[in-house]
Amino acid sequence: MIPLVSIIVPMYNVEPFIEECIDSLLRQTLSDIEIILVNDGTPDRSGEIAEDYAKRDARIRVIHQANGGLSSARNTGIKAARGTYIGFVDGDDYVSSAMFQRLTEEAEQNQLDIVGCGFYKQSSDRRTYVPPQLEANRVLTKPEMTEQLKHAHETRFIWYVWRYLYRRELFERANLLFDEDIRFAEDSPFNLSAFREAERVKMLDEGLYIYRENPNSLTEIPYKPAMDEHLQKQYQAKIAFYNHYGLAGACKEDLNVYICRHQLPMLLANACASPNSPKDIKKKIRQILSYDMVRQAVRHTPFQHEKLLRGERLVLALCKWRLTFLIKLFFEQRGTMKGSAKQA
């Protein structure tokens, strides 16, 4: 029997959370599902826990593989999926019991390629609702989505694949897979392609997914040595996408402002969080300012741009003037990284 929905759950160092995640999937009011748990070479007991669950419920399938990263684990799940629809859940998150029933109902009734929802951001002491970043409760057609792509970074609707349900035919039609060379902020290049190919899209203003702010996750580690490499690969993938579809001119400002508001501060904060000497940190800042993605964004975004906040304007001005000492001082004083922890 072919399931209606395949739910792909990558697992890597999620032992404290994976049981709550799987339990939330087993409580779905939609029973016609398969749960594909992909053990991405995790060193903890997540794989063993998954196998125990698989013995108890035939809807669960466990795949073990050598560590290849989140994109690799998701691709493994996509290739194994049999459902009419495909959804993604991170192993340290969990979902509402009604999530997949609500999404499939809308997809079936409206012949949707993609249907999405709002989500809750949960920390240790609070839960905050994040609504959809596209107009909710009406079907968006392909021409409308093409127009939305021009503002994809401003609205952030391309962040996070786990708040969406995708028709499997879309993967086959567009040969959709995650770029396995990108190991940080993987979701947005994938979603650019997915939404470009989708014929019909709809958002529900309902909080059906709970994203846990996990201080032990990769995205929360203060210093990430590979961040620069993977953000540059992400940038190159986006530029290739825009060029392929003739969208470079229309989308350039959106991408440049996004880099100035989010990725440039992330790169600089990451450099200042490194254990290197002050001299090496300033050298790294100069290197970041030489990246093509940064040069283009800094050159073409005026610091008076209406979308920039005061602190973002200050950082941009310091970068335009290449004041590495003040950049270093700013981020050391600030002590936090701008941007979303699970930014896509």
UniProtKB/Swiss-Prot annotation:
The protein's enzyme class: transferase
Matching CDD domains: Glyco_tranf_GTA_type (cd00761)
Its EC number(s): 2.4.-.-
Stimuli inducing this protein: Repressed by SinR.
Domain of life: Bacteria
GO biological process: polysaccharide biosynthetic process
Key words of the record: Exopolysaccharide synthesis, Glycosyltransferase, Transferase
Annotated GO MF terms: glycosyltransferase activity
Family: Belongs to the glycosyltransferase 2 family.
Name used for this protein in its record: Uncharacterized glycosyltransferase EpsJ
Originating organism: Bacillus subtilis (strain 168)
Gene of this entry: epsJ
